[in-house]
Amino acid sequence: MAFNLRNRSFLTLADFNTREMEYMLDLAEDLKKAKYAGYEGKNLKGKNIALIFEKSSTRTRCSFEVGAKDEGAHVTYLGPSGSHIGHKESVKDTARVLGGMFDGIEYRGFSQRNVEILAKYSGVPVWNGLTDEDHPTQVLADFLTAHEVLKKPYKDIKFAFVGDGQDNVSNALMLGAAVMGMEYHVVTPKELEPTKETLDKANEIAAKTGAKIVVTNDIKEGVKGMDVIYADVWVSMGESDDMWEKRINLLKPYQVTMDVMKATENPNVLFEHCLPAFHNLDTEVGKEIEKKFGLKEMEVTDEVFESEHSVVFREAENRMHTIKAVMVATLGEQN
């Protein structure tokens, strides 16, 4: 294509236009096919990549590590206790230190401001692996999965996020949908509607791309005609019991059940989730929730999670292919 993403950081999908985002998604498809066929290139050969994780991770860490290795890069993992970032050394100083040693930096942590500072001062591409406000790499996998299964152009796929409308994944989905010209519904309690800042940003982009952003408290109205129903956890780990109880009371009516899936009036509707999901009692956290609050399932029922509508594990695999595409597009030799 006639544009170049080399040396660009990947902080939020709002930083990209439709063609750039389509390019990364198309590249992910190509890289996935190459991996399946066993003839991957080494587009990141000789590159050194730092992975900063202030929060624990399964899918994001594995996706960056496997994706980088597939393309010939070397990875250094800095876990929650493995660096001084923000504690004994400022983010700005850390950026300048790591920028002198590495060709690219991934950051997964709390503050969006931190990933922006890393990008500003490191002098190398920085990739947002998750912050409290945004989760852009997740959304590329979400969109690619829906596109693969539904065989529809991206702009024709309709997404509805059901749950906490201020959730970082919902924010990222909204911005991504706006960039791609898609229809996106946030189905959420009034108390948890998206912030004005995020909604204004999405609508500003949507005005240029033809996207449609809808916020509603009505579940039936919000999911009708949708192609994808999306859910995420209701509460982050480490929150107080009072916060758990408050969130559960607010969001219990927004649990994704088979009735919600049927309310789409679309027999081919998909269910997506960024994972991990609390859909049964097979985890210690699930058992604790059941003991304290009497819930055997939270944001999604086990019936939906294990149904033919669910594409969550294909979606999880696609984290690796899309993250690989982001690294190759911004750091590799392919462009």
UniProtKB/Swiss-Prot annotation:
It holds the Pfam family OTCace. Pathway: Amino-acid degradation; L-arginine degradation via ADI pathway; carbamoyl phosphate from L-arginine: step 2/2. GO terms for cellular component: cytoplasm. Keywords: Arginine metabolism, Cytoplasm, Transferase. L-ornithine binds at N168, D232, S236, M237. Its main location: cytoplasm. The keyword Hydrolase does not apply. It catalyses: carbamoyl phosphate + L-ornithine = L-citrulline + phosphate + H(+). One of its GO terms (biological process) is arginine biosynthetic process via ornithine. It is found in: Cytoplasm. Its EC number is 2.1.3.3. Carbamoyl phosphate binds at S57, T58, R59, T60, R108, H135, P136, T137, Q138, C274, L275, R319. It is an enzyme of class 2 (transferase). It comes from the Bacteria. One of its GO terms (molecular function) is ornithine carbamoyltransferase activity. Reversibly catalyzes the transfer of the carbamoyl group from carbamoyl phosphate (CP) to the N(epsilon) atom of ornithine (ORN) to produce L-citrulline. PANTHER family: ORNITHINE CARBAMOYLTRANSFERASE, ORNITHINE CARBAMOYLTRANSFERASE, MITOCHONDRIAL. Belongs to the aspartate/ornithine carbamoyltransferase superfamily. OTCase family. This is Ornithine carbamoyltransferase. The gene is arcB.
